[in-house]
């Protein structure tokens, strides 16, 4: 209906230029201008277009509506807003929406936004009934409440189960107070439990990550909140400043201020390079590390403790090497140097002159220097 409707009988066309309304059983559409093509069962609307449905409303500059299929086609800036409690809204400039099935397909630029998450991609499919979105090509899933953005070639987001995953050149960016963590893996998975107040993201296969004060590689990795614990699994290696950290299992508490604590379990090993042929080393069953201002400052060794560290004079020249064995140890670190060591329970320590033993005889069991695997930049995580 309209205050003034012009109808062309031979062409079976009608139009209005001063606000009109189109209604069916569930939908009410209004616009300033409208053109109805009866033979094509198509209506074109422009200027202040509003489509209202019990479940949603569409606000657009212009759209075409196919009356036989109840499909809205968008060719300009469009916003689809859910009227339910989930507050989901969609933005697009090119795509279509099946109003009967509540399914849509959008082409770039596009975005689906829920309470704390947004999804976008070159192509985006969204089912308003199941609350499932699928994206293809330059996919981005952002969790605004956790400062996490996941990107890749293919993505999936389920609002009901609060899960999402991305594959293909997958990258996770987690913003901290001072810098950002960049992580790559074959597949990235995120899940949120709103009732328990817990969220997690997991990386599977070929994990590599870079942060200004922390880098690492492993097969799989998980991070949970609110405990802020990162767990590395299967051949994990971690680097902090000049220290290389390995163990069968590595667990770290990393908050917005950076790394705080470190737990190494089974075959625990920390080493740093003294010079081109010499290495400071610590090994044991279990290690508990503590960070100060983002740097590993102290390590408590529990079980089968061993250490090798080099001593220097006031000018930095090597004077000797300390080889110690003790069940438990407390070691203080200053960068790549051991600044203090306390041996607990039956200590056995020897300080050798620097030239008495060749460096090859001072490599502890389990030593391996893996610097070639270390990610050196954001781009290097894709190596």
Label every PLM stretch briefly.
Residues 1-383:
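Structural signature for solvent-exposed beta-strand/loop edge elements and short helix-capping sites
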């Amino acid at each position: 209906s309209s205050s003034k409707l012009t109808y062309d009988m031979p062409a079976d066309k009608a139009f209005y230029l001063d606000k009109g309304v189109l209604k069916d059983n569930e939908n009410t559409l209004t616009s300033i201008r409208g053109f109805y093509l009866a033979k094509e069962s198509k209506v074109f609307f422009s200027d202040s277009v509003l489509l209202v449905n019990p479940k949603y409303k569409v606000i657009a500059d212009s759209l075409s509506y196919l009356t036989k299929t109840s499909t809205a086609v968008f060719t300009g800036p469009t916003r689809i807003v859910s009227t339910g409690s989930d507050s989901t809204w969609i933005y697009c400039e090119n795509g279509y929406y099946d109003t009967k099935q509540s399914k849509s397909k959008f082409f770039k630029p596009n975005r689906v936004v829920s309470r704390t998450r947004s999804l976008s991609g070159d192509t985006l499919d969204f089912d308003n009934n199941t609350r499932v979105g699928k994206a293809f090509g330059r996919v981005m899933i952002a969790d605004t409440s956790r400062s996490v953005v996941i990107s890749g070639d293919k993505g999936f987001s389920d609002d009901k189960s609060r899960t999402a995953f991305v594959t293909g050149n997958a990258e996770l960016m987690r913003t901290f107070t001072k810098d950002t963590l960049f992580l790559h893996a074959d597949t990235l998975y995120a899940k949120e439990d709103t009732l328990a107040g817990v969220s997690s993201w997991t990386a599977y296969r070929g994990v590599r990550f870079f942060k200004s004060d922390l880098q690492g590689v492993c097969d799989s990795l998980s991070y949970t909140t609110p405990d802020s614990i990162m767990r590395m699994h299967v051949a994990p290696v971690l680097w902090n400043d000049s220290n290389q950290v390995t163990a069968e299992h590595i667990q770290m508490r990393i908050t917005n201020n950076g790394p705080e604590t470190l737990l190494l379990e089974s075959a625990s090993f920390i080493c740093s390079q003294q010079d081109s042929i010499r290495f400071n080393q610590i090994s044991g069953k279990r290690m508990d590390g503590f960070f100060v201002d983002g740097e590993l400052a102290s390590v408590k060794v529990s079980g089968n403790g061993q250490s090798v560290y080099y001593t220097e004079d006031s000018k930095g020249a090597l004077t000797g090497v300390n080889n110690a064995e003790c069940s438990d140890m407390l070691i203080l670190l200053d960068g790549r140097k051991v600044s203090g060591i306390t041996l607990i329970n039956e200590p056995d320590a020897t300080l050798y002159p620097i030239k008495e033993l060749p460096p090859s005889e001072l490599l502890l069991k389990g030593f391996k220097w893996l610097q070639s695997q270390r990610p050196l930049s954001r781009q290097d995580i894709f190596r």
